[in-house]
């Protein structure tokens, strides 16, 4: 490819030392090379003022995502060394405390970190991997896997999509990530919604509707992803990306229900294909797919900003306006991009759920 040589040249100029905590997890040579390459690409993008990095076959990658994957361990003592946040660098205390507060209210938290694109499609951005068709992509984000294990040991229910996304990254309705956008695709959302619904349906309180309540129909759309707008002026803009989305509810998308026992909260991964406008469509996002899978409407608290702290501040303010807001909630799904563990400049503040 030529990209490997360029990556090593940038690496030689910009190498800043060993990744924090990397000695604690033994990386295979190919994974170590992958981390070095994408770290170099991220630094090169930062130096040129670009936020998007072009990969193979029309795939575009978000430079902060590449940086996040390359820094190694990102919690505990390592957090302050690798986080973009000035305060609240460590996500671990905030997540564990949030789970504790919800648990005390009888609410079950499902943590849903969305795998970053490069962790599922490493062969599209690095020479370190050649993925054989039909086989699972090797795990290149072992630090995520370790972090989720630590969270589970502390009582947090983590839904790690990575094994399924890496094994089934090509679906009959397209790839699980958008080529030109920072978000997951319609196919990825449907897969995640099905896995979430399986967990919720197994809970004692849940009673499935007797008949399906919402129509579902796949259709093709064209989008110009947010990463296209992040390319340098010299880069040639690719043609619009064609995506298949599963639209829910026929002529009318299902409405969000504030009294639903299921609250979906998080960053724009909760809003893409749901809110319309520059998020591309309505009626085909995660809230819509969850509603279709469960047969009941869900509540939504999404933000276009960081899903780390801002959305929990929004929850606190909602509870301040209505002290009974959480009274009927059974499940909170906290969904955000996994890169937020290091790339959220707001950090991970420990906050009260309600006044």
Where do the PLM segments sit?
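Extracellular glycan-modifying ectodomains
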Residues: 2-355
């Amino acid at each position: 490819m030529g990209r490997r040589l360029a990556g090593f040249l940038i690496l030689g100029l910009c190498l800043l030392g060993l990744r924090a905590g990397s000695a604690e997890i033994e990386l295979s040579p190919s994974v170590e090379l992958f981390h070095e390459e994408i770290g170099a690409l991220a630094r090169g993008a930062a130096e040129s003022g670009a936020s998007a990095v072009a990969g193979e076959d029309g795939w575009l990658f978000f430079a902060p995502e590449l940086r996040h994957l390359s820094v190694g361990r990102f919690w505990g003592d390592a957090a302050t060394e690798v986080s973009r946040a000035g305060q609240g660098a460590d996500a671990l205390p905030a997540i564990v405390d949030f789970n504790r507060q919800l648990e005390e209210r009888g609410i079950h938290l499902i943590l849903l970190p969305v795998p970053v694109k490069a962790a599922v499609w490493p062969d599209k951005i690095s020479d370190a991997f050649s993925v054989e068709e039909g086989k699972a992509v090797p795990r290149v984000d072992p630090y995520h896997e370790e972090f989720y294990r630590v969270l589970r040991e502390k009582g947090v229910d983590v839904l790690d999509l990575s094994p399924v996304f890496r094994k089934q990254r090509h679906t009959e309705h397209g790839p699980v990530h958008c080529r030109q956008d920072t978000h997951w695709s319609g196919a990825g959302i449907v897969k995640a919604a099905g896995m979430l619904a399986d967990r919720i349906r197994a809970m004692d309180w849940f009673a499935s509707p007797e008949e399906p309540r919402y129509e579902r129909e796949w259709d093709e759309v064209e989008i110009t992803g947010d990463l296209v707008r992040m390319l340098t002026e010299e880069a040639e803009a690719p043609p619009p990306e064609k995506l298949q989305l599963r639209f829910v509810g026929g002529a009318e998308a299902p409405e969000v229900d504030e009294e639903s026992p299921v609250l979906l909260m998080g960053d724009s991964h909760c809003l893409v294909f749901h809110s319309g406008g520059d998020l591309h469509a309505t009626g085909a996002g995660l809230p819509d797919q969850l509603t279709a899978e469960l047969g009941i409407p869900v509540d939504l608290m999404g933000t276009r900003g960081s899903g780390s702290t801002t959305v929990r501040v929004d929850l606190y303010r909602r509870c301040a306006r209505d002290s009974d807001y959480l009274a009927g909630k059974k499940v909170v799904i906290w969904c955000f991009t996994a890169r937020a563990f290091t790339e959220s400049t707001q950090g991970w503040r420990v906050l009260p759920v309600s006044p």
